[in-house]
Amino acid sequence: MDGLPGRALGAACLLLLAAGWLGPEAWGSPTPPPSPAAPPPPPPPGALGGSQDTCTSCGGFRRPEELGRLDGDFLEAVKRHILNRLQMRGRPNITHAVPKAAMVTALRKLHAGKVREDGRVEIPHLDGHASPGADGQERVSEIISFAETDGLASSRVRLYFFISNEGNQNLFVVQASLWLYLKLLPYVLEKGSRRKVRVKVYFQEPGHGDRWDVVEKRVDLKRSGWHTLPLTEAIQALFERGERRLNLDVQCDGCQELAVVPVFVDPGEESHRPFVVVQARLVDSRHRIRKRGLECDGRTNLCCRQQFFIDFRLIGWSDWIIAPTGYYGNYCEGSCPAYLAGVPGSASSFHTAVVNQYRMRGLNPGTVNSCCIPTKLSTMSMLYFDDEYNIVKRDVPNMIVEECGCA
């Protein structure tokens, strides 16, 4: 399949398939179905890799004069698919960005990521391809939340964090930590000795405004640096009550005497702003049926997988999706002879959903023949900002078409 006409005609089928992924809400307001009375003109030679039956069998064929509009429709369908998989109603409204220095520090600490010369973040395994080993039953999310402050005068420093619980899912917190930077000021010490302080973090019990629990850690300091304190129980309790705001009071015993300064929310120290890291998992009990499929190589007319890459910069999403830089919105195309029909598993249920959509739109389902559709979908890792400016690292299931079949 070469050139824009081929890609756009293939996109006609994918538009229908994407709507099937998203469910009824993806269709928007009802529009009249295409008339099945007159057969469409044949596509340009080679436009679909050899078979005009591909899209007519799926009910998604469009005439050449409609192809320009269809590309835009296709991209909108892909956007809705991504937001649906992230359980978001719309893209976040990024009115003010998290300070770049703070974000870069957190990413380097947690992911060994790097910032390229063009300012884009590059992180191993977040390249838009399927995540290695991510198709198992266990789905893991990683959430990074940066500290804010109420500015209250107190002997303690009060910080708070808005921590997303990923669409109110039943998440189990595997590990959660507060990262705090301790800065050493000039101070005369005996040779070989270290500054020893005790950091205490008081966290407010959800639902009990007057009750505080504490975690503490003894720290021996030789130089300025980052230190972590465990908050697993505090954040698990927060999630269980359906709350998002985590209030912390931080004390440092011995810091003043030994010229140790914990860095909190300081405009002059953005790269050392405290942050909380939450690793949580959601167990998915569903099993996938694995099937082998064909790759579209220009030599086959049968149902196959066509690779298609979407750069997030080109659709205006690079301001809230940190990594990957784009999405492999692969799709299925090709003919489905009778001997290839009836692929079991996810294909059958998918085809049922598509036919039901056509029933609601008034199209006779008897005219819908066997269709080339995804039979295996894989997970993709994403790093993005949510509505609360948390950085979320999430393995998102059913994002990338890996194999295609007929049903």
Curated annotation (Swiss-Prot):
Disulfide bonds join C296-C304, C303-C372, C332-C404, C336-C406. Gene3D superfamilies: 2.60.120.970, Cystine-knot cytokines (2.10.90.10). InterPro entries: Cystine-knot_cytokine, INHBB_C, TGF-b_C, TGF-b_propeptide, TGF-beta-rel, TGFb_CS. Residues 30-46 have a biased composition (Pro residues). Pfam families: TGF_beta, TGFb_propeptide. Keywords: Cleavage on pair of basic residues, Disulfide bond, Glycoprotein, Growth factor, Hormone, Secreted, Signal. Its main location: secreted. Residues 29-292 form a propeptide. This is Inhibin beta B chain. The gene is INHBB.
